Each structure stands twice: as C-alpha cells, then as structure tokens.
Amino acid sequence: MARKKVQRKLDGWKSKEWYNIEAPVYLNRAIVGNTMAGDPSLLVGRNVETTVGELTNDMTKNNTKVILRINNVVGDIATTDLMGHELTTDYIRSIVKRQTSRIDANVDVKTKDGYVIRVKPTCFTIKRARSSQMQAIREMMVEIVKKRAAESDFETFMQEAILGRLSAAIYRQAKFIYPLRRVEIRKTEVETIPAAAPAPAAA
C-alpha cells in the first residue's frame, strides 16, 4: 500500500510542468521566478512577491517589495499584473528618529485610465513639528497624490510611486511648511482594475 501511495505522488509530480513568472512589460518583462503546476489555469490569481532590486538588478533597492498577480498563462510563461508595492518594515524602522515627527496619510486615488489605488505616503521631519504643521503636510500629501494620479495613466503613476518621483514631488512642496528629512510612498495597493484594461500581451 505504501509503495502505491509513493508511486501516485511521483506520477503526480511528473505530470506537472515548470512555468516562468514574468513581470509586466512596463517592468521590463523580467522573469521574477518560476513555479510548477499540473493545470496552468490554477496559477491564475496567485500573488507573487519580488523586489525592485531583483527587477532592476540593483540590490540597493531590495527594501521595496513589489506584488504581482498572475493573470494568464501563455505557453510556459505566466504573465502578471502589478498589484502594488510596500517598503520593508526594517527599512521604515531604520529611518524613524527620536525627537522628530512622522506624518502618515492614506488616500484612495483614481488614475486617468480608471484604476483605483490606495496610496500611503509618509513624511519624516527634521525636528518635532506642531500638530497644525503636521495636518498641513498631511493635507498637502493627499492633494499632490490625487493630482498626480488624475493626470497619469496607471503605469506612469505606479512607476512614479515606486521609483521615488512621487515622493520627491511631495518633498519639494511640503518642505516649505516644515523642514523635512525624508518622504516615502510607504505602500500602494490596487483596489480596482477597470473592465477596459488591456489584456496581457502574448509572450
């Protein structure tokens, strides 16, 4: 009986095939990993985590996690959608300093091509700010993020959020309210993908 169970497990393993997991075209279609499946349709909807460092071959950017979701399988390639990003907890802890203020915001925005994204920007001041200054900075962060999203398509906005251009735009304006040490987009989450979103390109 034991031999039959082992044989069935071996036969099931042999029936599975390897699939490469590919990032979207605007992330250079980088191969971010591989997985096995007996039925490729079971891969669709699975989330995969990688880092900006792995996507760009720049290991200094491994503190930024990128979340992808498999949307289709073509041949031995599993294509993906970008579902968001998040800075590692260790990285955030490393930039928190005593006697300073941390200002967080949480805002849902809509891009001009209809994607709804939850964005979580964070500011760190040089010294401790007053509550009125913190509120003014928070309101400015929300205003800038909403404006940039409304003016951008999904790909452009997410690249700006992940690669630092959006945080730089916040820094340039908010520093006049109170001196800032750093601004980060701590996290993004894709809440809604429009029905008219283009289908993934074939490999």
Swiss-Prot record:
The gene is rps3ae. Keywords: Ribonucleoprotein, Ribosomal protein. It comes from Methanosarcina acetivorans (strain ATCC 35395 / DSM 2834 / JCM 12185 / C2A). Pfam families: Ribosomal_S3Ae (PF01015). One of its GO terms (cellular component) is ribosome. GO terms for molecular function: structural constituent of ribosome. PROSITE patterns: RIBOSOMAL_S3AE. SMART domains: Ribosomal_S3Ae (SM01397). This is Small ribosomal subunit protein eS1. Belongs to the eukaryotic ribosomal protein eS1 family. It comes from the Archaea.
